[in-house]
Amino acid sequence: MTRKLITIVVCLLLLTGCQTAKKQPSKRSMYYWSTTFKLSTSQQHFLKTQHISRLYVRFFDVVTEPDGTLMPNATISFASPFPEKVELIPTIFITNDCMKQPGNTDLAEKILRRTLQMCETHDLPHPKEIQIDCDWTLSTRKRYYAFLAQLQQLARAKNICLSTTIRLHQLTQPAPPADKGVLMVYNTGDITRFDEAKPILNADSVASYLSRRKPAYDLQLSAAYPIFSWRVLFRGTRYVGIMHSDDELPVIAGDTIVTRQPTIDEILRAKDIVERWKASANNEVILFDLSSNNITKHNKSAYEKIFSH
């Protein structure tokens, strides 16, 4: 009888442990993608009420000059203090053209040094992690991976973790040399097509990508989902460009401006698909991005759904 009782207690403890594990909340994070760090009242409120614990802040881009030189561009300035109790992850965007340039063996050292100098200059906390964002391709993979391996070694010497973005199409390649990755679950379609209603996020496209990829991807992943929209100008059915402001592009009679924006339901569908493919990817949910327009489109419960669904 005692043995049976012990067995029952052990089973109950195991069951409780499994249920507890399933209920662990996801880490909540946001991207901040602007040239000026200045938090509005609505942004501060969003960070607080949505319990955001990490901010991936774009520090600068690395671009190619006409002579092939790699240069920093669009460096962020800080007009607001960084929020307390929120972890800062400096993020650097590198254009794929940079990876086409031979040489530049000191790029990793330059990026790390500049990032740490910016943190010191703006009285920001020493980062525990930095992230590199690059839309690398098969032709630039070898050079990009060599750069990451060098940066990872330099970062580890300063107790800094290295993460890198992973686009869906990049899952076909071996995992890059980094400590972790962020799977970008967006930009699944062609923005230039008039008949493409869901170019930012189509859950069916996500399912198609992931159904052909083994979940045993050799890198710890987080998942990033889109809450942004695009206003796209078409002349007939011909793509003209994205309207970042009303007067950015000339609009003539007969033109059409369409808004492409993922619905909350589409985001939740995509999140479910990622969950079935690799559940641990949703242990950290990141939204792109923390612009005031993006965080005021829906009511509070809609964003809560994305984080807690």
Feature map (PLM): residue ranges:
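Sec-dependent signal peptide recognition
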Residues: 3-9
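C-terminal motif of bacterial Sec signal peptides marking the signal peptidase cleavage site
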Residues: 16-17
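Chitinase-like catalytic core of GlcNAc-active glycosidases
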Residues: 23-32, 62-183
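Catalytic domains of carbohydrate-active enzymes, especially glycoside hydrolases
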Residues: 40-64, 121-123
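Conserved, mostly hydrophobic/aromatic
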Residues: 55, 132, 181, 223, ...
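A structural motif corresponding to the C-terminal end of an alpha-helix
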Residues: 82-85, 118-125, 154-155, 208-221, ...
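Substrate-binding surface in catalytic domains of secreted glycosidases
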Residues: 146-235
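Substrate-binding cleft of secreted/luminal carbohydrate-active enzymes
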Residues: 228, 236-309
